[in-house]
A protein has these predicted regions:
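Catalytic core of pol beta-like nucleotidyltransferases
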Residues: 1-27, 36-41, 51-110
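Short beta-strand->loop micro-motif that forms the acidic, two-metal-ion catalytic signature
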Residues: 46-50
Length: 110
């Protein structure tokens, strides 16, 4: 399975699982070594999920557990998914010290 196929699977699982938990998606951003192109065989996938609105902890936890489990089972690579809401992203997207700024600068919206 190549890079593009894995990315398509990751996006599909995130979108499908978000629908299940009524999570509105604003953006899905791949960042880190996979986005920069300097990844190795052992690199994980770093995903920033920007939601339309803030979601409660319980929903966030259920979403993360289910989506990560499905993704890892399907592509057999480790993955980190970070969730922030649109307001956080918009406020901090120009600050490199924040995850929003890092993802905006080096990330690829998928």
């Amino acid at each position: 399975m190549d890079f593009r196929e894995k990315l398509k699977i990751i996006k599909g699982i995130i979108v499908e699982t978000a629908k299940k938990y009524n999570i509105g998606i604003f953006k899905i951003i791949l960042f880190g070594s996979r986005a920069r192109g300097d990844y190795t065989e052992d690199s994980d996938w770093d995903i920033l999920l920007v939601t339309e609105k803030k979601i409660d902890r319980k929903t966030k936890r259920k979403f993360l557990v289910e989506s990560r489990r499905k993704i890892i089972k399907t592509i057999n690579d480790p993955i980190d998914i970070i969730i922030i809401d649109k307001d956080h992203f918009e406020e901090y997207k120009n600050i490199y010290g924040d995850i929003a700024g890092i993802a905006k600068l080096e990330g690829i919206t998928i």
